Amino acid sequence: APYVRQSIQGSLDRMGIDYVDLYQLHRPDPMTHPAETAAELDKLVDEGLVKYIGVSNYYPQQTLALKKYLKAPIISNQISISLLRLDPIYEGAAGGPGSVDSAGDGVLDQCIELDITPLAYSPIGGGWLSGKRQVPDDHGNKKNIENTLTALREMSDAYNGATPTQLAIAWLLSHPSGIIPLVGSNNPEHIKEMAAAGQIELSRTDWYKLWVAARGARVP
């Protein structure tokens, strides 16, 4: 896969460095056999241009297809997951009727099985779970967002006034797969707020309360 080498070499040149610690494939390429991609990735590792390999937006079968041909281990899978995006928690169709997880993908189960670290982008649902944005009336997920925010706010007092943002991140951090939320902001205070989520020890009962609120249905 020539584009893989072109991509990493371009990144190295732009940053003025000799290697990257982690190189992640942004998404699967349906027009390239995974054996071809794996061969190029292994060359990059052997040449010292890349230390570790990860993937992004890969479903379990896609990860297995790449892993079959790859000598280097896959150490990360960067995925969209939050209380508003629950699919990675489920295997197959384990979600409830009418819930946002009615067709789960089981990524987190695979991460546990294969010792892959899940990296969560959009951990507060594109900002909606901060509670600082007004949800438009025509937003397709308005009811779900508001129900989840209500549950987060009701839980605040039990965790020393934790914000919805902090509790939403703490919910991810509590999962046994070892999720690492990817957060960012131009505001240092927002960074401090999100970092403080790591100090919250969410109880099992409260974790499930948030899950039920986010699903919009009881857990079977």
Model-inferred region functions:
Residues P30-P220:
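Beta/alpha (TIM)-barrel catalytic core signal, keyed to glycine-rich beta->alpha loops juxtaposed to Asp/Glu
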